[in-house]
C-alpha cells in the first residue's frame, strides 16, 4: 500500500471533518468562525492558514525556561483551583496533576483532568523548589540552580501550591 506523505507547507485544509484544532486544549470553550468553515482558507490559497487568536500560554501549553540561575515552568491551569492541583517531585522529574469533578459551566457539565511530567536539570536545588498559582490561573513552578554542577539531591516529596492575588507576569509568546 502506497502512502503519500506531504510536507506541511503543502497541506490543504481537510474540510469540516478534520478541524485544525483537533488536539488543542479548548474543550468546552466554544468555537471560532474558522473552526466551522475551515475550507474557506484553502479556497483563498492552499498555503494560507488563519492564526489562532490566543497566545501560546493562554492555550494550555506550558513554557519551560532554564537559564544559568534558575529553572521555571509556566503552565496555564485557569480551570483548576489550588485544591485541584497536585505537584510532586520524584527523582529527576516534577509531576503536575490537575483534576476536578464534574461541575456546571456555561455549556453544560464538564470535568477536567491533566497530567504533565517534566525532567528537572540535575543541578536544581530540590530543597528550594516552589509552586504558585496566580489570580489569572498561571501555575509557576520554579527552583534555583546550584553552582559548579553540584547534584541537587533526589527524593520524592510534594510541593504545596500557594495562591497569589496578582495576575501572572509570564510573558505571552
From Swiss-Prot:
GO terms for molecular function: metal ion binding; structural constituent of eye lens; unfolded protein binding. Glycans are attached at residue 162. The modification N6-acetyllysine is found at residues 70, 99. Residues 52-162 form the sHSP domain. It comes from the Eukaryota. The keyword Kinase does not apply. Residues 144-173 are annotated as: Disordered. InterPro entries: A-crystallin/Hsp20_dom (IPR002068), Alpha-crystallin/HSP_16 (IPR055269), Alpha-crystallin/sHSP_animal (IPR001436), Alpha-crystallin_N (IPR003090), HSP20-like_chaperone (IPR008978). GO terms for biological process: lens development in camera-type eye; negative regulation of apoptotic process; protein refolding; response to heat. Gene3D superfamilies: 2.60.40.790. The keyword Signal does not apply. Zn(2+) 3 binds at residue 154. Zn(2+) 2 binds at residue 107. The modification Deamidated glutamine is found at residues 6, 50, 90, 147. Acetylation at Lys-70 may increase chaperone activity. Residues 153-167 have a biased composition (Basic and acidic residues). Contributes to the transparency and refractive index of the lens. Acts as a chaperone, preventing aggregation of various proteins under a wide range of stress conditions. Required for the correct formation of lens intermediate filaments as part of a complex composed of BFSP1, BFSP2 and CRYAA. PANTHER family: ALPHA-CRYSTALLIN A CHAIN, HEAT SHOCK PROTEIN HSP-12.2-RELATED. This is Alpha-crystallin A chain.
Amino acid at each position: 500500500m502506497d502512502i503519500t506523505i506531504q510536507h506541511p507547507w503543502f497541506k490543504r485544509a481537510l474540510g469540516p471533518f478534520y478541524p485544525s484544532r483537533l488536539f488543542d486544549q479548548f474543550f468546552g470553550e466554544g468555537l471560532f468562525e474558522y473552526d466551522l468553515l475551515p475550507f474557506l482558507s484553502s479556497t483563498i490559497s492552499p498555503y494560507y492558514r488563519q492564526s489562532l487568536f490566543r497566545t501560546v500560554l493562554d492555550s494550555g501549553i506550558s513554557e519551560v525556561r532554564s537559564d544559568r540561575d534558575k529553572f521555571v515552568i509556566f503552565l496555564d491551569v485557569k480551570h483548576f483551583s489550588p485544591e485541584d492541583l497536585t505537584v510532586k517531585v520524584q527523582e529527576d522529574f516534577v509531576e503536575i496533576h490537575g483534576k476536578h469533578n464534574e461541575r456546571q459551566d456555561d455549556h453544560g457539565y464538564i470535568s477536567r483532568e491533566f497530567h504533565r511530567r517534566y525532567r528537572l536539570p540535575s543541578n536544581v536545588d530540590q530543597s528550594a523548589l516552589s509552586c504558585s498559582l496566580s489570580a489569572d490561573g498561571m501555575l509557576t513552578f520554579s527552583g534555583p540552580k546550584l553552582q559548579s554542577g553540584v547534584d541537587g539531591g533526589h527524593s520524592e516529596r510534594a510541593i504545596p501550591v500557594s495562591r497569589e492575588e496578582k495576575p501572572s507576569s509570564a510573558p505571552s509568546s
